[in-house]
Amino acid sequence: MKIALAQINTTVAAIPANVARIKEYVQRAAAMGAELVCFPELTLTGYPPKDMLALPDFVEANLKAIDELARWSTKPALLVGFVDRSSEQQGKGLANAVALLANGRMQAKYHKWLLPTYDVFDEGRYFDPGKALQPMLLGEQRLGVTICEDMWNDATFWEKHRLYRYDPVEDMVRQGSDLLINLSASPFCIGKRAVKEKMLSAVSKRHGRTLIYVNSVGGNDSLIFDGGSMVFSPEGERLAALKDFEEDLLIYDTAQTTPGEMRLQFNDDVAQAHAALCLGVRDYVRK
């Protein structure tokens, strides 16, 4: 299966513009032979939407947009992040979600389980955690789709610093996922890339599954997202990497077993910090 990693720069609350960006990248990926296009966390709303989520019209506009994209979808299939209604009767009423869209409808959806409430994150204020999960079926592939923090709780890698009891990725593997896909909006900080690469490598190796990690890119207010999306083999080897600090699109063929394109451009802390500052200021002014 040819899978496109669509590392796009979305704007918080600019739902029509984000939809247009999604469609543009789907068309580009389709021309390259993609069968599935993966977008970052909360693609439709941008990340983080914060108190915009308290506005019913905003949530409804996002739901209408995901319905529109579902009707528009044919081939390739899409994995798109959006804000869904949760099933909680007494909770927040919303979920951080991803939908599998194909052939004119929503084929499946997933609600994020692990909601970070530390540092720059406050997702527990806005969202209810997921309550059920299962792999998404696309053709003969069983996709173990998770969202950002869901990947950051491996019991072996975080042996002494584990924040949650439950590991959605482990559960996805237990239920027969052939392939792991994590859609993220993971902000940049100095030194984080090295830790993230080690973790993703360890998770893919422990579960013996190819792992596709798609990160957001761009600046949204005080947060800067560095992109750097990656693919890891079942042996934990990095097979591909997208550019850091700019939009990018890469096709990964699941038949690939040896390292391919490595597009990362900034390999030391000073260069990464400079690139982050330039991107953050540029997007703050532009958006």
Predicted features by range, described:
Residues 1-287:
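Enzyme catalytic cores with a strong preference for nitrogen-chemistry domains
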